[in-house]
């Protein structure tokens, strides 16, 4: 059964909590919510078996986290902050796709993020057009053109994926929740990554699937080069998704190692 937390922005966010141990919060990318994302839930279940508190939540404006008004990046960050409070005040974040740029922004903005595990961050080099693209997505959202906003957001995805996404009515209904994704990606391309992320002093692991899109490996390499001590690696996965067993094993090792080396996290857990 879902649990709920109210954020500082007044939004009621639904989440599942599993396991007992150092915490990790999954931050999904554009579109998914718990009901249609079994791989993230399965990964959380496997993490719980490995001594990790795993949080899977419905992003603001999706699933059981329904809201009114403009869904800003700030509201999404407030949701992450509230969930960090739920698990004791400090947590690792696992971003997926544009959830990576949201997670990076959370850490850069000073939320109590213990570590970042980033799966296939779709970050292009600076000034690659993300600002203009996000503005167009936002324009269509503001005009009430949800289907057009979804099409614009996913215009660079393979047509067969867009066809699947458009076949799910809730994806179109929840298109306003894409604004934080676009805004975070535009921010992540607004300057060199070393300038944006280079001040982070937390463990960062960027991952890509062994079969992935052309943009993903250079992005992972760039993140690893930008953040002191960060690393990247290929993992079992394809078509932008991971394999739950392998991902859970990797995340559990990462979270436990991070926790063991982080005196703030250990103090928070007591």
Where are these regions (language model features)?
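Flexible "cap/lid" loop of the alpha/beta hydrolase fold
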Residues: 101-143
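Conserved alpha/beta-hydrolase "nucleophile elbow" surrounding the catalytic nucleophile
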Residues: 95-100
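Catalytic active-site module of serine/aspartate enzymes centered on a nucleophile-bearing elbow/loop
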Residues: 228-270
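Conserved alpha/beta-hydrolase catalytic His-Asp/Glu region
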Residues: 144-182
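Active-site loop/oxyanion-hole signature of alpha/beta-hydrolase fold enzymes
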Residues: 44-49, 56-91
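Short beta-to-alpha linker loops that shape the active-site pocket of alpha/beta-hydrolase fold enzymes
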Residues: 58-62, 122, 236-238
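Conserved HGGG/HGGXW glycine-rich cap/lid loop of the alpha/beta-hydrolase fold
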Residues: 4-64
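Conserved serine/cysteine hydrolase catalytic core
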Residues: 170-225, 233-244
């Amino acid at each position: 059964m879902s649990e709920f937390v109210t954020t500082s922005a007044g939004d009621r966010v639904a989440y599942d909590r599993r396991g007992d141990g150092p915490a990790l919060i999954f931050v999904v990318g554009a579109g998914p919510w718990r009901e249609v994302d079994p791989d993230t839930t399965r990964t959380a279940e496997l993490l719980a078996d490995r001594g990790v508190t795993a949080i899977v939540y419905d992003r603001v404006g999706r699933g059981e986290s329904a809201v009114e008004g403009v869904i800003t990046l700030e509201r999404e960050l407030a949701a992450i902050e509230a969930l960090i409070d739920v698990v004791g005040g400090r947590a690792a974040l696992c971003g997926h796709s544009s959830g990576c740029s949201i997670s990076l922004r959370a850490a850069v903005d000073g939320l109590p993020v213990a570590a970042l595990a980033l799966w296939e961050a779709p970050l292009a080099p600076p000034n690659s057009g993300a600002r203009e693209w996000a503005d167009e997505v936002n324009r269509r959202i503001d005009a009430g053109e949800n289907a057009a906003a979804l099409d614009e957001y996913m215009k660079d995805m393979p047509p067969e994926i867009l066809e699947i996404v458009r076949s799910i009515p809730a994806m179109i209904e929840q298109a306003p929740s894409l604004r934080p994704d676009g805004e975070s990606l535009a921010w992540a391309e607004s300057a060199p990554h070393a300038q944006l992320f280079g001040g982070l002093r937390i463990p960062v692991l960027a991952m890509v699937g062994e079969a992935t899109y052309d943009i993903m490996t250079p992005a992972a390499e760039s993140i690893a080069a930008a953040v002191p001590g960060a690393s990247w690696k290929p993992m079992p996965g394809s078509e932008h998704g991971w394999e739950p067993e392998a991902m859970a094993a990797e995340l559990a090792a990462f979270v436990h190692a991070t926790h063991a080396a982080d005196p703030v996290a250990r103090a928070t857990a007591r």
